[in-house]
Structure formats: C-alpha cells, structure tokens
C-alpha cells in the first residue's frame, strides 16, 4: 500500500513560499517568428555580397508581410521557401536587366545625339494635378514658358508622363472593334512602370545627391489618396527639391467626359463615363489633402495655384487661388467651393445635366468644409479684386477684417462671397451693407 502524502495545514498552505519564476520565460510562437524575421533584416544589412543581401531582404519582407497579416507564418516551409526564392530572383533579375537596358539606352542617346538632362544646383519641380481629362496636358506650354522665365532651357528639365507607355505596350491598330478598351488592357503594366519610375528617381537622387528640374504630369489615384507616393518620393523631394510649383486643375466633371471622348478620338484611348466621373470624385477629394500635406512642411519652398479650366480650349485657365506656406490669395471663391461640390456628383449620370448633385447639396453653406480648413491652416487669407489686383478682405488667424470697403461693396455681388460671409462672418456682412 503506497504511503499517503500528509496533508498540509491551512496556515502552511497560506504561507507557502511561491515557486521561483523561471529566469527565461518561454517565448510564444509569434515572438519566436518575429525574432527570426528581424534577424534576417540584421543579417541582410550586414551582408557583404549582393546575392546574400537580396536573399535576406526577401526573407524579411515576404515573411514579415505574412506574419503581420496572418499573425503567424504557417506550417509549410517549402511554400515559404518558394515564394521567397521568387521574390529574391525577381529583385536581382530586374536589377540585372535594368543594368543591361541602361547600356543600350546610353548607346542610343549617343547615337541619336540626344542631350542628357543634367542635375540642377537648385532643383525645381512643377507638378500638374487634376482629374483624368481635366486638360492638364494642354497646360504644358504654359509650364514650359514658366520654366523659361525661371532661366531653365527647353531641354534642361525632365517631363514625367508615364501614360505615353500605353501606346508602346499595345498595338492599337490590331485591336479592331475593341480598340476603345485599350486603356484597360494596359492599366496594370502602366502602374508597374509608374512604380519603377518612382524608385528610379529616388535611387538616382540618392546616388548623385541631386536631382534635375522636373515637370510632372500624370494622373493616378495614389497621387491623391494613398501613402505610397509619400513613402517612395516624399523624402526625395523634401531632401533634394529646392522649390515646388503645384497647379491644381479644376474642370467641371461633365466637361472631363466630353474632353475624354475627344481625346479618345485623337489618341485611341477611351474610358467609361462612370470612370471619368469616379476619377473626378477621387481627385477633388484628394486635392485638399495634397495641398495641406505640402503646406505643412517648411521645405521645399512650396507655391500653389488653383486654375479654373472651364474656359474654351486653347485659352489659359482662370486663376482661382494661389499661395505658399502660411498665405493664400483667393481670386474666385465660387470655383474654390466647387472643389467640394464636385465630390458629390452622380457617377451613374447618362446626360450632362444629371452629373451635378441636387440643388440643396450645392448650396454654399453645405460646401464650406475645404474653405474652413484653409482658414485653420493659413495664417493669412486675402481676397483679391480681379480688376485692381488689390486685397479688399482678409482673414488673419481666423478673424475677418475689411481691407478696402470701397472694393468690398462691388465684390459682394458675387453670390458665393456673400453667402460665405453670411455663414462665417454675418456681423461683417451687416456692417458692409449700404444704409
């Protein structure tokens, strides 16, 4: 008969010494996996040959993405090995192909007698932002003229417009009756080129510690909405660009559909009406974000203009507003408010008159969100009389003040200005009313 274990007394159980904790607590599976992944990063940074660095880089990025998304790596090492090998080979292969293509490009430049774009001592970037078919490309002559005024020769700056690759990726003439869908057929490929171009600009700038003058003309959703461009190019621009000029092109959404159709007739690239209108919402919702993103930084020096492109083709757009960090001048309040109105359009419209939002949603009082943000973000906002180029009204640190009463009166015939004041500065409006 086995001996029975004597029972401990109540006092003994209450005052029993707690077991000593282990000096090295066991790691959870998740902790072990993340430690392993971080170790791959450390090994990659310390690697002294390109192959090892690429392998560790792929292990860190691929396994890190899986573990972050799923919470663990799973139990299929052969599958994980396969995708990491593919990732590393794609990375190394693309670099090798790029080096060989670079040799051919350099030979072609020499053979054709092209000029290489030199890095600039004080780099300037001009950027056009607007919805698809808003008329950005038609403004290039204006920007080229501005470059000349800044002392930059015609061949002294690079133009970034990846859309030209669509024509080179597809044989449009071979598409026959489906040629209107050509843009769709190459969308993913153009995105790949766009992304590679961003990385190329960054790598070249970091290598040379400089960057040439650039004119950027491209539409893409992440220009407004995502953080991808921030990760890839934002730091490059902040570090190397001295001055940035950004032009926001404001075009009525129904006009972009018409312009897009006419562009398709000439270039063979079409989009659905719904796509054009959807792009408008994306662009006009993103313009304020992009504006405030750059005005919140001290560098580079940042100059912006909002342009009303509802003018006949072949004529320069009208100035809506302009400014820099800390200051904004408004010439045409109605068009500035339109930026918010255009976010409410009907993407399923089948006729031009169906595009705009219902009348009650278009009232000034319901579309002051962007303007109120401007009041908070800019220390000084000036309203400029278009005839005399004189400031007649200012908002200084959120407070309205009349700068020229004689000029304010005729400008109050502008319904948008009067309704804005009725909402935000009713006392000033009543004081300015003729007695």
Please describe what each predicted stretch is.
Residues 121-126, 211-212:
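Pre-Walker A (Motif I) flank of P-loop NTPase domains
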Residues 126-150:
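Glycine-rich phosphate-binding P-loop
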Residues 155-157, 239-245, 267, 299-303:
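Short glycine-/polar-rich loops that comprise or flank the Walker A/P-loop
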Residues 238-261:
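Conserved phosphate-donor/acceptor-positioning beta-strand/loop module used by diverse small-molecule
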Residues 254, 258-434:
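Conserved GTP-binding G-domain of TRAFAC-class P-loop NTPases and closely related GTPase folds
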């Amino acid at each position: 008969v086995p001996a029975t274990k004597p029972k401990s007394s109540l006092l003994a159980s209450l005052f029993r010494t707690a077991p000593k904790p282990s000096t090295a607590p066991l790691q959870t599976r998740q902790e072990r996996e993340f430690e392993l992944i971080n170790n791959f990063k450390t090994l990659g940074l310390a690697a002294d040959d390109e192959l090892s660095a690429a392998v560790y880089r792929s292990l860190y990025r691929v396994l890190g993405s899986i573990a972050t998304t799923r919470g663990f790596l799973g139990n299929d090492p052969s599958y994980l090995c396969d995708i990491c090998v593919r990732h590393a080979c794609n990375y190394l292969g693309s670099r090798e192909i790029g080096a060989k293509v670079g040799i051919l490009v350099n030979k072609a430049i020499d053979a054709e007698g092209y000029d290489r774009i030199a890095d600039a001592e004080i780099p300037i970037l001009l950027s056009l932002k607007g919805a698809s078919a808003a008329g950005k490309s038609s403004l290039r002559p204006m920007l080229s003229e501005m470059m000349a005024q800044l002392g930059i020769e015609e061949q002294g700056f690079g133009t970034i417009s990846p859309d030209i690759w669509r024509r080179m990726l597809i044989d449009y003439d071979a598409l026959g009756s489906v040629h209107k869908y050509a843009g769709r057929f190459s969308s993913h490929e153009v995105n790949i080129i766009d992304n590679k171009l961003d990385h190329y600009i960054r790598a070249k700038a970091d290598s040379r510690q400089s960057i040439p003058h650039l004119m950027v003309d491209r539409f893409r959703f992440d220009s407004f909405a995502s953080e991808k461009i921030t990760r890839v190019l934002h730091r490059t621009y902040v570090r190397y660009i001295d001055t940035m000029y950004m032009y926001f092109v404001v075009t009525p959404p129904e006009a972009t559909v018409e312009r897009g159709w006419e562009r398709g007739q000439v270039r063979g690239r079409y989009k659905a009406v719904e796509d054009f209108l959807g792009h408008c919402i994306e662009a006009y919702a993103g313009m304020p974000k992009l504006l405030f993103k750059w005005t919140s930084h001290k560098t580079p020096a940042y100059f912006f203009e909002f342009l009303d492109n509802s003018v006949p083709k072949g004529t320069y757009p009208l100035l809506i507003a302009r400014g820099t960090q800390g200051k904004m001048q408004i010439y045409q309040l109605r068009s500035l408010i339109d930026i918010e109105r255009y976010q409410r359009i009907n993407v399923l419209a089948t006729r031009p008159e169906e595009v705009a939002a219902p009348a009650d949603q278009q009232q000034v009082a319901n579309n002051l969100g962007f303007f109120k943000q401007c009041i908070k973000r800019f220390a000084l906002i000036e309203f400029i009389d278009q005839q005399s180029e004189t400031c007649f009204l200012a908002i200084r640190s959120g407070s309205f003040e009349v700068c020229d009463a004689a000029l304010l009166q005729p400008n109050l015939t502008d319904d948008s200005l009067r309704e804005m004041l009725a909402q935000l500065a009713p006392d000033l409006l009543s004081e300015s009313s003729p007695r």
